[in-house]
Amino acid sequence: MTLPHSLGGAGDPRPPQAMEVHRLEHRQEEEQKEERQHSLRMGSSVRRRTFRSSEEEHEFSAADYALAAALALTASSELSWEAQLRRQTSAVELEERGQKRVGFGNDWERTEIAFLQTHRLLRQRRDWKTLRRRTEEKVQEAKELRELCYGRGPWFWIPLRSHAVWEHTTVLLTCTVQASPPPQVTWYKNDTRIDPRLFRAGKYRITNNYGLLSLEIRRCAIEDSATYTVRVKNAHGQASSFAKVLVRTYLGKDAGFDSEIFKRSTFGPSVEFTSVLKPVFAREKEPFSLSCLFSEDVLDAESIQWFRDGSLLRSSRRRKILYTDRQASLKVSCTYKEDEGLYMVRVPSPFGPREQSTYVLVRDAEAENPGAPGSPLNVRCLDVNRDCLILTWAPPSDTRGNPITAYTIERCQGESGEWIACHEAPGGTCRCPIQGLVEGQSYRFRVRAISRVGSSVPSKASELVVMGDHDAARRKTEIPFDLGNKITISTDAFEDTVTIPSPPTNVHASEIREAYVVLAWEEPSPRDRAPLTYSLEKSVIGSGTWEAISSESPVRSPRFAVLDLEKKKSYVFRVRAMNQYGLSDPSEPSEPIALRGPPATLPPPAQVQAFRDTQTSVSLTWDPVKDPELLGYYIYSRKVGTSEWQTVNNKPIQGTRFTVPGLRTGKEYEFCVRSVSEAGVGESSAATEPIRVKQALATPSAPYGFALLNCGKNEMVIGWKPPKRRGGGKILGYFLDQHDSEELDWHAVNQQPIPTRVCKVSDLHEGHFYEFRARAANWAGVGELSAPSSLFECKEWTMPQPGPPYDVRASEVRATSLVLQWEPPLYMGAGPVTGYHVSFQEEGSEQWKPVTPGPISGTHLRVSDLQPGKSYVFQVQAMNSAGLGQPSMPTDPVLLEDKPGAHEIEVGVDEEGFIYLAFEAPEAPDSSEFQWSKDYKGPLDPQRVKIEDKVNKSKVILKEPGLEDLGTYSVIVTDADEDISASHTLTEEELEKLKKLSHEIRNPVIKLISGWNIDILERGEVRLWLEVEKLSPAAELHLIFNNKEIFSSPNRKINFDREKGLVEVIIQNLSEEDKGSYTAQLQDGKAKNQITLTLVDDDFDKLLRKADAKRRDWKRKQGPYFERPLQWKVTEDCQVQLTCKVTNTKKETRFQWFFQRAEMPDGQYDPETGTGLLCIEELSKKDKGIYRAMVSDDRGEDDTILDLTGDALDAIFTELGRIGALSATPLKIQGTEEGIRIFSKVKYYNVEYMKTTWFHKDKRLESGDRIRTGTTLDEIWLHILDPKDSDKGKYTLEIAAGKEVRQLSTDLSGQAFEDAMAEHQRLKTLAIIEKNRAKVVRGLPDVATIMEDKTLCLTCIVSGDPTPEISWLKNDQPVTFLDRYRMEVRGTEVTITIEKVNSEDSGRYGVFVKNKYGSETGQVTISVFKHGDEPKELKSM
């Protein structure tokens, strides 16, 4: 690509003389061109024009001819090189045209043209004077031009031209300068002078060939993008020209209109995947999702497409396709087996669609009954008619070891959601006819597999089907008319009208199975529009009788499945049609039909082969089974050494190739394949050869990172990095090519592969620049060719500093650390290497930072304290006495992370007692080797260690462990694409532990799991037991008691369980004779152990007492006994409940309560639950004492005692106080006649166990003249007498009950104080009124009975201030005190006297007292009886 060139600087214009000459030459060329064209036109004319020019009238002298010749020579010499080039080009074109013309006529035409041109030239009219004047002017101009050109300042005939180039290519800037004398040339980059000596050798090359100036920039990098200027200067002046160079990163292989830049500018950015779809292992009935990330936003998200097995997927109720934030995802809310398959996502891109794919495997859901088979799949409805259809499905791949005996079919009508079992199909077939359906209704079906264990979960429901006459469409015809309109007519309209239908035809069996036959026939023709039904008849061959086939509903479709046929018999069938007018004649009988035998499953495929694919997958291929009944294949796998086959896929595979994902790297697997048909799953194929899961072998990728390690006069030492992808095999060697920059061809350095990555290249030319490239080779072949290296100058190194270290590599990469290793430089410089300087560069940074503050002496370094998740680049520089040398080639970016599944070195002791270090790498290629080193200083010493290598595992055994073996052991796995390495530092402390363990293994001791233990059994037996590790059947036990071996006896039983490692001694009745030491001596082969138990002194006495107590307790429990003894509980209502529970009772069992040895009838007992309950409503000191519950029957008795004295009683009262304190209500304020009362209600209060304290404004209050405090059983109060303003404020009541303290507060101020005072004043006034009010205090009875003729005297006491007015009432009427009635008042005593009472005096009397504060009436009823009539009241006395 080129950019518009830039002319010289604005201050350097061309000389005016040169511009004038250039215009003159251009004008002359144009005139000559017009003359040639005119001559050609004249020469081709048929007519020959003859005329005489004005020049023919003149005669030319010799001087004139000489002057014309000079003019011609001058003009020709003054032509520019561009005009000459155009003239030569025109001549070549004319010559080529002439060569293309052939034939005699063409030659004559050329002759005629030449003749006419000459004739025209000779006959041209010229003005002699004008010609002479022009010639003189030409000669004068040429002389002046020569004088100007002889000595002049520089100017650019051809300026620099801007360039845009790809990265790593070469650009050549050229220009032509004219000057006399030759100028001095200087090149600049962004106004900085270019000195090739200051740059890498061969970077810049500057040349000057007779005015042609050039600057060559090799291996362009992004940093070379700049403005380049060339300045020329001599004695007459100076000039400059500049051009821009743009270096672009290579983005694609195409160029021009197919280039990446053109596409990006035209179509937008390219969309690439930044993540990889991984295999998904979903489970039936559960959700799963797939997602992938893109490098750019997808402008049209709807253009992202998802496919399953090549079929386009769309969003639905169960499946959602989403796109957000550069992430496309497919989410399935409920997974079915039908969702299994190869999923592919396709995203459009300007350079063609980008695709990724992965496989989704769906495992069976958890069975409702363990061991039940998996669910069927692919349920489909075929041959749908008015009232019947054929249902098919695929059998499940996993029956869980139980053969399928049948299939249950469930039906759902419309969208009701109600599933009803409708049919059952035998287990040997996956096809079943469904009849009895309703025309016009829609149905869905699902299937369950049944085995002897149970039923599977249901399959996915079939698609919704609508029952109808699908032949009706065939009988309809569309007739177009009137520009696009159509009319639909039925052929039934053209048939003859019939009444009774004709018989059906072509009765035949469309399907014959083991359990049924599907009959089909053609409808009668003509059939008329009346709806038809059919009746069927069957006949056994040879019987001569016809039998009607019954059906639950009328047959409306020309299909019918016959289910009740007998095997080994042949049948013929015939059909009758029936409509509303009648029944047709029978059809012709069908051909003889018999049920088939049981369907056979398909044979397994042959030639099942397994091939390596990736680190976690294996590719399978097999020969196809050529059978039309084939539905697909099921694949099964198992690890080598196991017997159970695991299902790989649950949806039949249609092809003959499959990649099994999700396998464990390094493990060996076997595979088999089974054919699937409607008859079921066939037999398994032969198992494949065991295959280890590894990456398939491929050719390696290209080497890279070439570096110059040493250089002589005619030789170089080149190093490079290994391929990033080694192809799963060992690199056998490298092929190196070299290229001299001054030559065109590449030359091979070696014919045989170089085993190392360092090569010495000889026979080079000093001062030349060379570049190199290489290929790696493994067992798969020669890999990719690397890109050319940078140009290296072949110039002998003489600098005093050392050369670059090489082969800098990172290993043992973890989340925060890694280990760097490198090789020392090949060029030492002026002296030996004294150390190394290691620096690093963080991701995204251009600054190199030192790893350590000073140099290190070794060729390895552990770098720690790095940031997880970041990438780092490292480089190393060697140093000697002269200083730091050249830096090494930087490492590739190293990402710090803990890789999942990464292995570490295992340290332990084997079965023979040897200490070992082992490392396992399942992902290592087969050709890998385990390279062990100690302290990173090379191979291990074979005198001290022994190395054992197995498949994917290496083991280092220490022969004689000692202090010499301490250090850091590291291991690296070769030939792996990724870093597989680890290290372990063996310390002295760890070595001592391992040596101790080694001694134990070589001198084994039976491992003691549990020493001697003592248990007391239910009946009081004593069990002595100990547990050791599992022993062999040959193990021996010797039990020593008091230095004497004992054996089993009736009182002392000895048990020895070798399988469990259990030794036990059961002593029936422990006594003094069993006191002493028990020693168990165990021996199992070489292993021994001895365990001793001592039972003496207090230990034995305690054991003896416990055994006796246990024995007595066992005897107690032979009859009714207390399972739960007496215990107390305080309820929220402050009741005390005593409870206990009895067990082992019967109907005759008696329960009694006692208090202080006296039986209590108030106690309760529930025989059903065995619960006893005694409630104490209000506990007081009188309830203090001993409570006892007793249960008894003929088997024995038991009792339980609760002592409610002392601490137990205090605990109950404390609990009552706690509950009472918690029950306290918020403080209330109440006005009284004496003052203001503040109180709280409680459920219980006890002065001894509850303390109350009142506070006013946080100051404790004490009872006094104005402040009184008190409590009752249910209330705590504070009474303020004669309240004042100083009594306002916050009042707090603190209740303490044991450790429980509760505070209640209220604020006696503001409205609360005003309300209380108002109530106080009101009550006080009422009290005064009540005190002074007139009232009858006492004296009058309710009833007074008296005999006639007696005197009645009634006296009462009245009060009131002032003295009240007194009057008597009889039957609410005032009493007139005359004759026999008399009233007497003596102070507060009022008396009424009635003399000689009679029956008229009977009635209701009242004394009415009244003063200014109120009044009151005292009532009395007087009853007068006659002589001899004693009232009832007196009789009852």
UniProtKB/Swiss-Prot annotation:
Residue ranges of coiled coil: 120-149
Domain (Ig-like C2-type) ranges: 154-246, 269-361, 1120-1205, 1334-1423
GO molecular function, a single term: protein homodimerization activity
Swiss-Prot/TrEMBL keywords: Coiled coil, Cytoplasm, Immunoglobulin domain, Repeat
Main localization of the protein described in the UniProt heading: cytoplasm
Entries under Pfam families matching the protein: fn3, I-set
Domain of life: Eukaryota
One GO term (biological process): sarcomere organization
Domain Fibronectin type-III: 375-469, 503-598, 604-696, 702-797, 804-899
GO terms under cellular component: M band
SMART domains: FN3 (SM00060), IG (SM00409), IGc2 (SM00408)
Region ranges (Disordered): 1-49
Feature: compositional bias, Basic and acidic residues: 20-38
rRNA-binding found in the keyword field: no
UniProt cross-references to Gene3D superfamilies, sorted A to Z: Immunoglobulins
Subcellular location: Cytoplasm, Myofibril, Sarcomere, M line
Known role: May link the intermediate filament cytoskeleton to the M-disk of the myofibrils in striated muscle.
Assembly description: Homodimer.
Name of the protein: Myomesin-3
